[in-house]
Amino acid sequence: MALGPNCGILLFLAVSGCGHPQVSNSGSRIVGGHAAPAGTWPWQASLRLHKVHVCGGSLLSPEWVLTAAHCFSGSVNSSDYQVHLGELTVTLSPHFSTVKRIIMYTGSPGPPGSSGDIALVQLSSPVALSSQVQPVCLPEASADFYPGMQCWVTGWGYTGEGEPLKPPYNLQEAKVSVVDVKTCSQAYNSPNGSLIQPDMLCARGPGDACQDDSGGPLVCQVAGTWQQAGVVSWGEGCGRPDRPGVYARVTAYVNWIHHHIPEAGGSGMQGLPWAPLLAALFWPSLFLLLVSGVLMAKYWLSSPSHAASEL
């Protein structure tokens, strides 16, 4: 179909909504807790109390972060917290988001090892998504993260028992395997029964989460998409072979999360409504590139006398 001189074509390209970092995970890294390359885990958040890192977290949408409820044992006042996103190191960066609201599943921080150790953090304003800041996908409530499944845990916590992370304070990653419920229950057996509850998931390395990793994500790749299986919750020691790390099982809380965040990214199409949208607008002499409605670049096309310009 021919176009008149004042007509144009508008093309839309939907960008995958969650779980697809622009820097791929090579799968060849040494197991056990090593520095993560920039952009590999773009949903990783640092939760800070009075500018001091206290917990990890994961970005679910431009306005919401998932973390652990016990992270707020120091304060339940949202104005005391800041959230850093898109950063590889824990530094005193001036770029952070303030917190508008904290929603804990149990209504208040519980003691270590308690059930319901999950919380949502609403940011004061949505963050801009980029190659360094992307949301992770939520699994379906029926998803099965089976025993032996290979997953990754990330954070800025201790690198061993009594060993704080050393400069340059780079984000650490460790490959872990999901542990079956029976084995984990036996590992944490007590006179009153097992400490492992139905809303908990266990995984072990030799890599493991440790102090200050709480609230961070345990993610597993399913059909090429990274889904969050767990939230770092508790454990006995760090990296002990007979004591798996214990996580809040995300599948147990997916419906609760979607109740508060309808736009949170699922493993399928439900992640797309808030995803970045590319729009290419063509006129006979002008090309405009928009991302989420923001003009990123404009190019004059037809006349060689027009120099290409970028905003």
UniProtKB/Swiss-Prot annotation:
Topology within the bilayer: Single-pass membrane protein
Location of this chain's protein in the cell: Membrane
Family: Belongs to the peptidase S1 family. Tryptase subfamily.
Cellular compartments per GO CC: membrane
Transmembrane segments: 277-297
Disulfide bridge positions per record: C18-C137, C55-C71, C151-C220, C184-C202, C210-C238
The protein's name: Tryptase gamma
Enzyme Commission number(s) of this protein: 3.4.21.-
Pfam families in the record: Trypsin
Domain Peptidase S1: 30-262
GO annotation (BP), single: proteolysis
InterPro entries reported for this sequence: Peptidase_S1_PA, Peptidase_S1_PA_chymotrypsin, Peptidase_S1A, Trypsin_dom, TRYPSIN_HIS
GO molecular function: serine-type endopeptidase activity; serine-type peptidase activity
